[in-house]
């Protein structure tokens, strides 16, 4: 297993429910060990070894102080560790399985953050996998738990279940028809949070949003997932209606926008991250509307991931200035689309 190779994790490679709109689902459980200082106050390297010792050979342990900054950035771009872990976790580590759909961060804000990812809208599958791992760990190690408040976490917004359920969605229809603001306001009024592609602290870009629960106390894991699933089903329906409206009422303008973006990606020699992201979003919409039968969703995911800065530095084998990065990005995009 070489997690730093340019390949898609299984949750980006495989098909999932409603994956014309939903890119992925994720369940994250925050846990801390009983009678140990939380990592935000004191990080102990022996905590990593203690937790890692509870897992078998199906998981690979990667310690943050044993890899380069570039390798950390690659893990962030693959959504296997958080930006917080990359920048602030001196004695942090991550346990990964072969498929890269399970990521267990150690010594992040909490002692453990168990993440399970699935393609499309499959929150219940992710929940089942996360709870199975959680139960396995709890058989071997004692968690910090309070009868009144549930699982104790570094951030008070996570106490209770300690669970964050999140869904990554592509909503170009709602963005283009200018209905996205009212949809986001409705989502927030129901107690959910809308963020960017890298979660907390990141801004939505290129019509990609992350929707997650805000409440972790007073509801069970199943209830939280049921509520988020219902919200997502409404968002999916609204996005599909918006796409249909665009195709029926503004067909020529939509085709022009999509094919201009395709032309840019297949012919560019210099392209910025923002320009590439916007064009990839347009082409992904075109793929979903049947304009490009030769381009798969998997190919679109490759474009998103491998045009990121860390993967480009890996491709070049060195650090680059801004212009060099734009040139390499254009080259990688053309190669993925078969137009070298």
From Swiss-Prot:
Gene Ontology terms: biological process: phosphocreatine biosynthetic process
Pfam short name (any one): ATP-gua_Ptrans
EC number: 2.7.14.1
Classification via CDD domains: bacterial_phosphagen_kinase
Alphabetically ordered keywords of this record: ATP-binding, Kinase, Nucleotide-binding, Transferase
Binding site for ATP: 24-28, 79, 113, 164-168, 195-200
InterPro entries: Arg_Kinase, ATP-guanido_PTrfase, ATP-guanido_PTrfase_cat, Gln_synth/guanido_kin_cat_dom
Enzyme class: transferase
Domain of life assignment: Bacteria
Catalytic activity: L-arginyl-[protein] + ATP = N(omega)-phospho-L-arginyl-[protein] + ADP + H(+)
GO MF terms held by the record: ATP binding; creatine kinase activity; protein kinase activity
GO cellular component, one term: extracellular space
Residue ranges annotated for the Phosphagen kinase C-terminal domain, each copy included: 21-242
Protein family membership: Belongs to the ATP:guanido phosphotransferase family.
HAMAP family on file: Prot_Arg_kinase
Function: Catalyzes the specific phosphorylation of arginine residues in proteins.
NCBIfam families: PRK01059.1-2, PRK01059.1-4
Protein name: Protein-arginine kinase
Species in which this protein is naturally found: Listeria monocytogenes serotype 4a (strain HCC23)
